[in-house]
Amino acid sequence: MVLYTTPFPNSCLSALHAVSWALIFPCYWLVDRLLASFIPTTYEKRQRADDPCCLQLFCTVLFTPVYLALLVAALPFAFLGFIFWSPLQSARRPYSYSRLEDKNPAGGAALLSEWKGTGAGKSFCFATANVCLLPDSLARLNNVFNTQARAKEIGQRIRNGAARPQIKIYIDSPTNTSISAASFSSLVSPQGGDGSRAVPGSIKRTASVEYKGDGGRHPSDEAANGPASGEQADGSLEDSCIVRIGGEEGGRPQEADDPAAGSQARNGAGGTPKGQTPNHNQRDGDSGSLGSPSASRESLVKARAGQDSGGSGEPGANSKLLYKTSVVKKAAARRRRHPDEAFDHEVSAFFPANLDFLCLQEVFDKRAAAKLKEQLHGYFEYILYDVGVYGCHGCCNFKCLNSGLFFASRYPVMDVAYHCYPNGCSFDALASKGALFLKVQVGSTPQDQRIVGYIACTHLHAPPEDSAVRCEQLDLLQDWLADFRKSTSSTSTANPEELVVFDVICGDLNFDNCSSDDKLEQQHSLFTRYKDPCRLGPGEEKPWAIGTLLDTNGLYDEDVCTPDNLQKVLESEEGRREYLAFPTSKSPGAGQKGRKDLLKGNGRRIDYMLHAEEGLCPDWKAEVEEFSFITQLSGLTDHLPVAMRLMVSAGEEEA
């Protein structure tokens, strides 16, 4: 399938569209600024309360007549531009595809050659987030503002979080339940390798810090500054760090004589100091940014290499990193596993390291989408943005906004399809909300069979009273997904050209699994075909699952204004009741605070990550390895991003 890199099929239409939008934009911008000046956020209200001279109010009164005068002057030009813009939308393509050619060893082409579908399994990490990048006046209805600056900061934080070192902690205690047994293979053999998954006979208590290249580096950094310090000439950045936290004999750490340790890159073994991660270069968003990998003391283990046998009499001091046990235990405590759970789950201050696929919702503003794309291209090679339709093309109602869907991938995209929900009503009818379907290639077998996966990203109808509309959209979602798989799958079942190893649905579904008003959606057949890792059954959540919709009134409180603070708050039941949104109460006169005191549960979880256990290739299985609720976008959106790591392996393999 040919992917569309431009919104129009030829340059003539593109030029005509650019001219028509240039005529419309001044009017659009003035209306947005005029409305935004009358919708203050709680942050701005607090600033005004601290302003004894009422300077901000004076500016609003002063500039409102100016905006109105300019708006009247811009209206004729906007009307002329609209005459050309509207019919052009019938020829507009439903998305724009962008690929950044990446020569890094972690680029998409190199990733395909890593995994042949034999030997060890491979994990893939998915994340979804509603980022509320609406025009500024509409974003303020959700108590967020400055859409353009937020778009850039969101991109920086996601990039820095995904490109940070991947930390895994392994403890040999047979009673420990805070670590992932399924993750152990990634310590023994690198992901994507075909090496044996055999467990060494003696496992020491270790913490593994794995990082796979400076994927978070901005594309322009290397051109301007040259290769990052510490990078090898060939760009290979495969390194790891073993941290001893237990198993001492006589008060001294044991030597790293394991077979597993022998497969790790040893710190200080070469001329390059391995204790410094290459993606800690000074770059956009690192200095003072909450998205910096160094922003959280508790989410990362800080490594520092020792001097070359300078002040240490202990042999091998510069090839081992010693840490206090309490520091590593603090990091390990972030992962908690329920006794009956087969995977790790946590509230994390960072997006998962080595994030493979990112699905975003509410990226409605075109300029914000461009800024977001520019930032994320520092890590993701393949991006689809500006997804949706405008005008009356393909839908009953006139569409002023696109779908808001945005997709980024480290792996090549093979096929794409988009469908607009035809039953939108109320204010949701102004946006072309729909579903984006993607087929990605993640490897190839020795027999030249492609290893592929399917991903669907969607955003359902928002008004809470329209349950029937959402159920109809879920029906359409399943039908469209079945048609997409049928139209893009290999024709021969006896000798297939492709192996399907995962099928994932993610997005903002705008209903939860705890509200009595959402019973219709909770019992939908989608949840029989796709598994929700956070759900026990209709209306029943797993005890560790928390809501993903924040109470907008508290977005700028000091307790939750940073990723670390929000993480700590959400780990306590009292904090969740204070800062998460809960189902609306039907009892009249019940205050927000008093209502929450009477509620049970952990808030409204409306952002979902679902995966299929059936419909994959025979003898293959996809199992959840980790599930995360992420606080890294605190203060930038009213939703919590969620992430899921799937371990894909042949069914006959032993874990």
Curated annotation (Swiss-Prot):
Q: Which gene encodes it?
A: Smpd3
Name of protein: Sphingomyelin phosphodiesterase 3
Compartments it resides in: Golgi apparatus membrane; Cell membrane
The record's section on Gene3D superfamilies has: Endonuclease/exonuclease/phosphatase
Per its UniProt record, the required cofactor names are: Mg(2+)
Q: Where does Mg(2+) bind?
A: 362
Function statement = Catalyzes the hydrolysis of sphingomyelin to form ceramide and phosphocholine. Ceramide mediates numerous cellular functions, such as apoptosis and growth arrest, and is capable of regulating these 2 cellular events independently. Also hydrolyzes sphingosylphosphocholine. Regulates the cell cycle by acting as a growth suppressor in confluent cells. Probably acts as a regulator of postnatal development and participates in bone and dentin mineralization.
Please give the residue positions where the record annotates the modification Phosphoserine: 178, 289
> What family does the entry list?
Belongs to the neutral sphingomyelinase family.
| Activity regulation (record text) | Inhibited by nSMase inhibitor GW4869. Binding of anionic phospholipids (APLs) such as phosphatidylserine (PS) and phosphatidic acid (PA) increases enzymatic activity.
Q: Which organism is it from?
A: Mus musculus
